[in-house]
Structures are given as C-alpha cells and as structure tokens.
C-alpha cells in the first residue's frame, strides 16, 4: 500500500526549504514592514496626542486672556461712564449756579430800576398833584 522510497523525504525537504525561503523572502520583510508601520502609527498617535494637549492648553490660555481682556474692557467702560456722569453732574451744577447768579443779578437790577422808578415818580407825584390841584381849583388857590 505505501511505498517508502526517497520521495517522502525529498518532499519533506522541499517543504522545509520552501518554508525557509518564504520566511526569509516574504514573512520576515512583511513582519518588519508591519512592525515599522505599527511603530509609525504609535509615534504619530503619540505626537497627535501631544499636539492636542498643547492645543487644549493654548485654548485655555487664550480663553483666560480673552476673559481678562473682557473684564478689563468692562472696567474701563464703567470707569468712563462714571467719569462722564461726574463731568455731566459738574456741568449741571455749574449751569445751575450760573442760572441762579443770573437770576439774582436780574432780580437786583429789577429792584434797582424799581427804586429808581419810585424815586422818579415821587418827584413827579408832587408836580402832578400840584398841576391837578391847579386845574381843579385854579392857580390862585394853590400855593
């Protein structure tokens, strides 16, 4: 049924030789390429994670700076509004003082003119009274 001749050892030797050749020519270079590719992927992933961490740190820093800048701008705006309010209040107070001073000056001038008018009229009252009496009674009776 089975013949044991040199065919079986030759076939075994061919199989071993083929395995050694395939290992040297195909499997080792292929596993080397796969290992290099896996290492490249690990390095790239590690670099990407580092870049992501740096980017997130920069984003946090910029957000902090932006928040600080917003706070400063709000403080500057509040300060400017307070200054404007103070300046407006000072101007209103100055205008009120000026209006009061003008009012008092006009009132004093009116009072002075009133006094002058009364003095002028007092002088004329005597003269007019005399003229009225002369017209009513006649010039001979009034003296």
UniProtKB/Swiss-Prot annotation:
Q: Share what the entry says about its subunit structure, partners included.
A: F-type ATPases have 2 components, F(1) - the catalytic core - and F(0) - the membrane proton channel. F(1) has five subunits: alpha(3), beta(3), gamma(1), delta(1), epsilon(1). F(0) has four main subunits: a(1), b(1), b'(1) and c(10-14). The alpha and beta chains form an alternating ring which encloses part of the gamma chain. F(1) is attached to F(0) by a central stalk formed by the gamma and epsilon chains, while a peripheral stalk is formed by the delta, b and b' chains.
Family affiliation: Belongs to the ATPase B chain family.
Highest taxon above the source species: Bacteria
- Gene name? atpF2
Using the UniProt record, give the first listed, main subcellular location. membrane
Q: How does it sit in the membrane?
A: Single-pass membrane protein
Q: What is this protein called?
A: ATP synthase subunit b'
Q: Which organism is it from?
A: Microcystis aeruginosa (strain NIES-843 / IAM M-2473)
Gene Ontology molecular function: proton-transporting ATP synthase activity, rotational mechanism; proton-transporting ATPase activity, rotational mechanism
Alphabetized, the UniProt keywords read: ATP synthesis, CF(0), Hydrogen ion transport, Ion transport, Membrane, Thylakoid, Transmembrane, Transmembrane helix, Transport
Protein task: F(1)F(0) ATP synthase produces ATP from ADP in the presence of a proton or sodium gradient. F-type ATPases consist of two structural domains, F(1) containing the extramembraneous catalytic core and F(0) containing the membrane proton channel, linked together by a central stalk and a peripheral stalk. During catalysis, ATP synthesis in the catalytic domain of F(1) is coupled via a rotary mechanism of the central stalk subunits to proton translocation.
Compartment(s) where it occurs, according to its Swiss-Prot or TrEMBL record: Cellular thylakoid membrane
Disulfide bond positions? none
Q: Which Pfam families match?
A: ATP-synt_B
Q: Which GO terms describe its cellular component?
A: plasma membrane-derived thylakoid membrane; proton-transporting ATP synthase complex
Residues annotated as transmembrane: 6-26
């Amino acid at each position: 049924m089975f013949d044991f001749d040199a065919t079986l050892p030759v076939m075994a030797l061919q199989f071993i030789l083929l395995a050694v050749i395939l290992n040297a020519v195909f499997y080792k270079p292929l596993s080397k390429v796969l290992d290099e590719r896996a290492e490249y992927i690990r390095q790239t992933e590690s670099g990407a994670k580092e870049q992501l961490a740096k980017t997130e740190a920069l984003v946090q820093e910029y957000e902090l700076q932006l928040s600080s800048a917003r706070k400063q701008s709000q403080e500057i705006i509040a300060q400017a509004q307070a200054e404007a309010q103070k300046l407006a209040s000072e101007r209103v107070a100055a205008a009120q003082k000026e209006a009061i001073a003008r009012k008092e000056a006009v009132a004093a001038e009116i009072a002075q003119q009133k006094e002058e008018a009364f003095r002028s009229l007092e002088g004329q009252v005597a003269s007019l009274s005399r003229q009225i009496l002369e017209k009513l009674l006649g010039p001979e009776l009034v003296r």
